[in-house]
């Protein structure tokens, strides 16, 4: 479980070895990373399910996926907010600009930017993952910043994931800055989104997106008495944000969406108005949930 660049460690198998390989584990526990872990040599499978007991947890630093042909299964990512990690842009697990990637049955939590951000990839799948408890006050220079993730890609699938206890970006759907609307094809279905605060899902500029059969459950942090409680997605396009930051031209293009079968379940504990808002969004996703 030591994080050293020596034979037998996870870092050695990821950073030193190359070619087609599968990393298996003979022990279980937490690997306290000594620095960022960057997956740069592709043709790799990390088989976390081979670890005995409670499996493998990577803690302390971000993990970056920077290679093609990668499978990661049954791993836990707990970045935290160590003082020597820049909080801005630090995701528990993320990657861009690569292809043929599958992330399966993993858990990502306690990030200072987003828990899991994968966009601008090609042939990508994120499935059966638990994405929870981003750090709202984790040291980001913008202040409160507990976000789930940025999702997108060219033929990208996000299904059967749980996003829970994030302020916003549940997820934020984002295109590649150098991409085109024709290439951005994303399928988001059978996910559970629970207890958002500032926003649930939003964005989708210049993307073709399916949002199908997802389950939205407002929680204690979700504002009452507002449209956010019954919101499935806030479709957006941007030229600049509140900080006057300019966006690439692709962000000034409306996306195309197929939205159907999503359920917003509020229960009746927060009063008739909120219950009615969520029931309407479930009955007509487009009219009341967008």
Each language-model region and where it sits:
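A mature extracytoplasmic/lumenal domain signature
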Residues: 2, 27-29, 50, 62, ...
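Acidic glycine-/aspartate-rich tracts in secreted/extracellular proteins
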Residues: 2-4, 21, 28-30, 50-53, ...
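Soluble non-cytosolic domains of exported or imported proteins
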Residues: 4-8, 66, 182, 253
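Extracellular beta-strand/beta-solenoid scaffold signature
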Residues: 58-63, 84-95, 110-118, 139-153, ...
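Extracellular beta-strand-rich solenoid/capping regions of secreted or surface-exposed proteins
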Residues: 7-19, 30-47, 54-73, 79-99, ...
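Right-handed parallel beta-helix
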Residues: 43, 48, 68-79, 97-110, ...
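Extracellular "leader-to-stem" segments immediately downstream of a signal peptide or signal-anchor
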Residues: 1-22, 32, 272-290
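Extracellular beta-rich repeat passengers
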Residues: 172, 177, 182-290
């Amino acid at each position: 479980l030591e994080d050293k660049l020596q034979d037998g460690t996870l870092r050695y198998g990821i950073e030193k070895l190359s070619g087609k390989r599968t990393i298996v584990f003979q022990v279980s526990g937490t690997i306290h990373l000594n620095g960022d872990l960057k997956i740069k040599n592709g043709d790799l499978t990390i088989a976390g399910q081979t670890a005995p007991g409670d499996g493998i947890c990577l803690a302390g630093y971000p993990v970056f996926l920077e290679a093609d042909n990668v499978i990661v299964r049954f791993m836990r990512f707990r970045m935290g907010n160590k003082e020597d990690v820049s909080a801005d842009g630090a995701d528990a697990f993320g990657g861009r600009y690569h292809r043929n990637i599958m992330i399966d049955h993993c858990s990502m939590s306690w990030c200072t930017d987003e828990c899991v951000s994968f966009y601008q990839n090609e042939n990508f799948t994120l499935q059966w993952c638990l994405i929870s408890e981003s750090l709202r006050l984790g040291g980001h220079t913008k202040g409160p910043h507990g976000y789930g993730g940025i999702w997108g890609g060219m033929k990208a699938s996000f299904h059967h994931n749980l996003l829970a206890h994030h302020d916003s970006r549940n997820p934020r759907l984002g295109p590649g800055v150098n991409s085109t609307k024709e290439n951005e094809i994303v399928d988001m279905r059978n996910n559970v989104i629970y207890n958002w605060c500032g926003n649930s899902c939003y964005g989708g500029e210049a993307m073709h997106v399916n949002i199908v059969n997802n389950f939205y459950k407002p929680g204690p942090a979700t504002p009452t008495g507002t449209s956010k409680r019954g919101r499935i997605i806030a479709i957006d396009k941007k030229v600049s944000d509140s900080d006057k930051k300019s966006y690439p031209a692709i962000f000034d293009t409306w996306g195309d969406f197929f939205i159907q079968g999503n359920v917003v379940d509020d229960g009746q504990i927060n009063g008739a108005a909120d219950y009615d808002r969520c029931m309407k969004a479930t009955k007509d996703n487009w009219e009341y949930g967008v």
